[in-house]
Amino acid sequence: LGMAGAVLAGSLSSPLMAAELDEVVFGTNWYAQAEHGGFYQAKATGLYEKYGLDVSIEMGGPQVNGMQLLVSGKRDFSMGYAVGAVKAVEQGMPVTTVAAAFQGDPQALIAHPHITSLEQIKAEGLPVYIAAFANTTFWPWLKSKYGYTDDMIRPYTFSVAPFLADKDIVQQGYLSSEPFAMEKAGIQPSVFLLADYGYPAYATTIETTDGLIEENPDLVRRFVQASMEGWASYFKDPAPGNALIKEANPEMTDEQIAYGIAKMQEYGLVTGGDAATRGIGVMTDARWAKIHEFMLEAGLVDASLDIHDVYSLDYLPTEPVLP
């Protein structure tokens, strides 16, 4: 009887413990991949539970409007992008960016090996294949900093086939995605990571609603803390996070994940810049001022916007999560 009682008590304790966790829905910006690894790692290794959270991760994709899902209350947190966040707040969305997992944007221009600089692309007037979103993010920056012109633009359809067929094509790409496909096809492309040339945007940010911040600031703080600990853990041993990534996105291969991790580390996207000394996820007023300045210069945002309405530094880890 004692044994049966113990078993019964044991089976009861799990749901009771689960009931004490705050349920949270976090939406990513694309299908599961290495660039989301820290969040999946925090879930896989129990870091979210350690901070009293029961987190469901929902994938983004081409048809998913993350901002809409966040503002409508279907998600508590959303993976965002600094430039998009500024626009959202300007349009009256009640959202705030509370952390940045990536100190630099993984967006790059990719060219064939004989192209050695961003200046050369302009000098030779090469066609640059970009997606529509580039017009309100990095393209205006390339125009103001490098003199690129709109007549260089060609529409990018997220296929590297045109690039592989023509040595004079330049295209946008994600550091760990298109170059991987090109290398598989036997080309070692020139990759110009825009962040390395001064493009100021934070990426893979955590956005939440002003309502949640008001209602439960402690929950926001715990989600940020656990997520950034997840990133530190992911770079030490990514296996737990990778298992969840592949479960969510069965088309993702081990090789592609390994390439993604290698590129994040090589370019210090998560652990470089301010994060190296001030902890993963860190944001600064100075950096947001640069983002604001670029957007003002490019005519992407109205002068009436107060940049401090876009972000808050109050929910960053109190104990920095050093890489």
Where are the model-predicted features located?
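N-terminal export leaders
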Residues: 1-4
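Sec/Tat signal peptide C-region and signal peptidase I cleavage site
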Residues: 13-18
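Short, glycine-/small- and polar/acidic-enriched structural segments
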Residues: 19-165, 169-173, 192
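Structured segments of extracytoplasmic/periplasmic soluble domains
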Residues: 42-45, 51, 69, 73, ...
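Pocket-lining segment of extracytoplasmic ligand-binding domains
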Residues: 83-84, 158-253
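Short, surface-exposed acidic
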Residues: 148-153, 251-262, 302-309
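Secondary-structure end/capping motifs
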Residues: 215-298
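Conserved C-terminal helix/tail region of periplasmic/extracytoplasmic solute-binding proteins
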Residues: 285-323
